[in-house]
Curated annotation (Swiss-Prot):
Disulfide bonds: none annotated. The active site is at D11, D130. The keyword Coiled coil does not apply. It is an enzyme of class 4 (lyase). Heterodimer of HisH and HisF. Keywords: Amino-acid biosynthesis, Cytoplasm, Histidine biosynthesis, Lyase. The gene is hisF. This is Imidazole glycerol phosphate synthase subunit HisF. Its EC number is 4.3.2.10.
Amino acid sequence: MLTRRIIPCLDVRNGRVVKGKKFKDIVDVDSPEVLGKFYSDCGADELVFYDITASNEERKTSLEFVTKVAENINIPFCVGGGVNKLEDFTDILRKGADKVSINSSAVKNPELIREASLKFGAQCVVLSIDAKKNEEGSWSVYVKGGREKTNLDAIEWAVKGVELGAGEIVVNSMDEDGMKNGYDIELLSKITSLVNVPVIASGGAGKKEDFYEAVNKSNVDGILAASVFHFGEIKINDLKKYLKDMGVEVRL
């Protein structure tokens, strides 16, 4: 049975972890290294750090926090935001990250996925997709931290990303982000049925049952959340025990 991963997501702005709703209403939480160590000690399987203003400000990821995180935790972690070329992958991986996430830059230059996969291995390349549902029922891809709509269909883009060499897909529902109403099961199910790499659910966790539903109904490999962890609403150990009791294989 596949072991599912519980992954806290830490959005970083100006060297601090922050959290908002639907990419707005930003609240300060803590420093990346302190919160990262806390989650590492509490049983998280992996961490994801996004420098959420790097792409919109057209700058590189802040590497200072990457070094500090690597020195403080003992679980894998992924870093994204402002990754535009192979050298950015090299810099982030050398600072201690295990994976690099690309979003806006991959839309602008899809070949970056292939180039990075060939140089560093598909396991290091994570395609992050910010998706928002349209009135007719499809999902559009957004870039620059959710600020700019593209003409890409989110499901088609996920499939294309895997074809190019992405080793993992993070699917973030902008409609559900920070709303705590549950994950976008419909979108996740469509993507997991079409790709053969791990898919991570993001956006919408509000209670333990939402995590179970994401695994049970959409067959995702990992479940990512932010505010329910940051503000102590759900404890990772409690969540894992609940999932285990529900028949989900997790690492305790």
